[in-house]
Amino acid sequence: KTTTAFKLASKYVLASKKVMVVSLDKNRSHANSQITAFTNQYGVIFKEAESYLECMELVETSGVDLAIFDTQGCGQYDWSEIESLRAFTQQFEFLETHLVVSASMKDVDIFGTVQHFSSLNVQSLIVTKVDETISLGVLANVSFKTPLLISYLSTGPSFQKDFSVATPKEIAKRILMEHNQQEYQVLRRLANT
């Protein structure tokens, strides 16, 4: 999720926006070289906070165009953490909430994740690790079977070229390309025998 937050930040920086990423992850030290390199390269402000009040103070005093909150990760069955996230998100007047899921997850797991995080008023999904699976039918299934749009696709480690807006055309192209790839055809035959 943290890498995804920075990829999203880079999109806005390239559009000449002043961006801040605020980490609310209490379980991890963010003083790592990847974050330092990214903030130096793109000019993204990076801060850590522990509460809504700290977040609001950071946003109000920073003069940024966009603040991206990188919340602590939690599993779909961690009800107390989901409730904490819900309580946090409800305090904001203007907040767009994206749920980050992996393309390599099974459909049932993504549907369960969407259901369990629905109390957060999630507006869309960001699908990561698109490059790590050859079975992208999950993108179509999620699009048809959940009320959420897929907003972004993450297809690799590059902050700029491997993160894009998810359009219906792009999703359809990826699914159709998947079915025509020789490796996919071989694995599909093996799975059906």
Model-derived features: where do they sit?
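Phosphate-binding active sites in nucleotide-utilizing proteins
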Residues: 2-3, 14-21
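Hydrophobic positions on the alpha1 helix immediately C-terminal to the Walker A/P-loop
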Residues: 3-4, 8, 34
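Active-site signature of alpha/beta-hydrolase-fold catalytic machinery across serine-
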Residues: 7, 11, 141
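Switch II (G3) loop of P-loop NTPases
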Residues: 19-30, 39-81
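Short, glycine/polar-rich helix-capping loops at beta-to-alpha or helix-loop-helix junctions
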Residues: 29-32, 137
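Conserved catalytic-core segment of NTP-binding enzymes
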Residues: 51-60, 76-181
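Short, charged, intrinsically disordered terminal tails
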Residues: 176-193
